[in-house]
Swiss-Prot record:
PANTHER family: 30S RIBOSOMAL PROTEIN S14, SMALL RIBOSOMAL SUBUNIT PROTEIN US14M. Coiled coil: none annotated. One of its GO terms (cellular component) is chloroplast. Its main location: plastid. Transmembrane segments: none annotated. This is Small ribosomal subunit protein uS14c. One of its GO terms (molecular function) is rRNA binding.
Length: 100
């Protein structure tokens, strides 16, 4: 189980990312279209003035039940060992154990 402070920090980052998503998107598009170097520097300055935690690269996908940051399955939002336990218990509809 992850510390609650880490989980709350991640939630705060998600809120910031959603809040600044549109604001961050427009300068990034303009940077790719900018022709002069001075324009690019100016647009980079605008991006750097935004909060650091509003960047989508700072988000980390965590397990829904335990908060574990590694070994997550995107389809279910669970880490590998929790996913395995829930499939064995039949708690995930449509998920079956593999056998060949």
């Amino acid at each position: 189980m992850a510390k609650k402070s880490l989980i709350e920090r991640e939630k705060k980052r998600q809120k910031l990312e959603q809040k600044y998503h549109l604001i961050r998107r427009s300068p990034k598009k303009q940077i790719s279209k900018a022709q002069s170097l001075s324009e690019k520097w100016e647009l980079h300055g605008k991006l750097q003035s935004l909060p650091r935690n509003s960047a989508p690269t700072r988000l980390r996908r965590r397990c829904f039940s335990t908060g574990r940051p590694r070994g997550n399955c995107r389809d279910f939002g669970l880490s590998g060992h929790i996913l395995r336990e829930m499939v064995h218990e039949g708690l995930l509809p449509g998920a079956t154990r593999s056998s060949w």
